[in-house]
Amino acid sequence: MNLRPLHDRVIVKRLDQETKTASGIVIPDAAAEKPDQGEVLAIGPGKRDDKGAPIALDVKVGDRVLFGKYAGQTVKVDGQELLVMREEDIMAVVNAK
């Protein structure tokens, strides 16, 4: 991927959504909503404070994150759909068990 986010921007790849419910019902692609979880692929250097020092981001590359349904801007890079969003659009980091 040849995309480097600036400031507090984060590049996220949506994770595939389950196409089958717990009871075994298959959800067709046309009825499935876009997933609201993704994996962080790249992060920017962060915002700057009043003195010009960078403020580090709370997320890191590889984190699994939750975000709003309409968060971010969709871009296509190397045939892959990615989201570019601000860190503040990310609601939570999903911790692995």
Curated annotation (Swiss-Prot):
GO MF annotation, one: metal ion binding
SUPFAM superfamilies: GroES-like (SSF50129)
Keywords: Chaperone, Cytoplasm
GO cellular component: cytoplasm
InterPro entries, A to Z: Chaperonin_GroES, Chaperonin_GroES_sf, Chaprnonin_Cpn10_CS, GroES-like_sf
A single GO BP: chaperone cofactor-dependent protein refolding
Highest taxon listed in the record's lineage: Bacteria
Ranges in coiled-coil conformation: none
Subcellular location: Cytoplasm
Principal location: cytoplasm
Function per UniProt: Together with the chaperonin GroEL, plays an essential role in assisting protein folding. The GroEL-GroES system forms a nano-cage that allows encapsulation of the non-native substrate proteins and provides a physical environment optimized to promote and accelerate protein folding. GroES binds to the apical surface of the GroEL ring, thereby capping the opening of the GroEL channel.
Family: Belongs to the GroES chaperonin family.
Subunit structure: Heptamer of 7 subunits arranged in a ring. Interacts with the chaperonin GroEL.
Protein's UniProt name: Co-chaperonin GroES
Taxonomic classification: Bacteria, Pseudomonadati, Pseudomonadota, Betaproteobacteria, Burkholderiales
Gene: groES
